């Protein structure tokens, strides 16, 4: 399993596409930090009640969430599966000593670590934003858990599409993922809670909301269901390959 993780990390690190993602995300977060800082500090002159630090942090976290979870993670997940298809490695993996669960966990962990590396690239900007105050360490930890649960779910959705389709995979992936993020925001208020972006914004509010943890548990539950469905499909394929090998 560790060999799969290392292989996937090398695949992403050696691609110009990954370095372009790194540069684009850092540039985007830097620009949003500068714009938000100027805007909110100007606003505080006329309204001292504005919580500048918390508002800046909310904008940065929301932007990073959309960039990583909504844009970068699907690309990395689909590329991970397509690379195995191009090189016809899947059949070799299926016939190896690794179980289907280990293969899936290896692919999932590789993409999660690559996504986490993209987040780490923006760490200096978030450290700089601490000088504006307004948020607590607990906010960072809660946001990290929301990132992990949602990222896991969206990566598994991308895996499922990449294993099922041969064309327009990224288009379908973006369609589903961006719909989950944004469509609930234009629906009546109770449906807002389906959107992980709503949950993320809720985590940085001064008062805690138990719905945050309920939704995080829901994302992990749906992710587990998709994982089981992918496992069942691949296990059936592995069984067929082994039967053909015996013949």
Regions found by a protein language model. Name each.
Residues 17-41, 66-69, 175-184, 224:
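Hydrophobic alpha-helical transmembrane segments of multi-pass membrane transport/permease proteins
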Residues 1-23, 239-247:
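Aromatic- and glycine-rich beta-strand/loop motifs that create alpha-glucan
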Residues 39-51, 173-241:
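Terminal transmembrane helical anchor/hairpin motif
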Residues 55-59, 109-170:
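Secretory targeting signals
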Residues 57-83:
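Long, hydrophobic alpha-helical segments
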Residues 73-94, 107-108:
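Transmembrane helix boundary and interhelical loop/hinge segments in multi-pass membrane proteins
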């Amino acid at each position: 399993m560790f060999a799969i993780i290392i292989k996937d990390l090398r695949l992403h690190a050696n691609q110009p596409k990954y370095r372009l993602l790194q540069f684009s995300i850092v540039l985007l977060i830097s620009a949003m930090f500068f714009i938000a800082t100027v805007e909110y500090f100007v606003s505080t002159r006329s309204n001292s009640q504005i919580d500048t630090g918390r508002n800046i942090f909310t904008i940065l976290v929301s932007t990073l969430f959309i960039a990583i979870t909504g844009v970068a993670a699907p690309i990395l997940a689909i590329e991970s599966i397509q690379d195995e298809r191009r090189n016809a490695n899947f059949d070799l993996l299926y016939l190896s000593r690794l179980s289907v669960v280990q293969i899936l966990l290896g692919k999932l962990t590789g993409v999660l670590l690559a996504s986490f590396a993209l987040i780490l690239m923006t760490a200096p900007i978030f450290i700089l934003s601490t000088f504006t105050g307004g948020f607590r360490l607990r906010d960072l930890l809660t946001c990290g858990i929301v990132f992990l649960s949602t990222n896991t779910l969206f990566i598994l959705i991308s895996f499922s599409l990449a294993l099922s389709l041969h064309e327009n995979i990224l288009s379908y992936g973006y369609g589903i993922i961006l719909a989950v993020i944004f469509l609930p925001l234009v629906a009546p208020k109770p449906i807002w809670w389906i959107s992980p972006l709503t949950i993320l914004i809720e985590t940085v509010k001064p008062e805690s909301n138990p719905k945050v943890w309920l939704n995080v548990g829901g994302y992990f539950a749906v992710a587990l269901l998709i994982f089981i469905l992918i496992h069942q499909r691949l296990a059936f394929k592995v069984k067929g390959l082994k039967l053909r090998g015996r013949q």
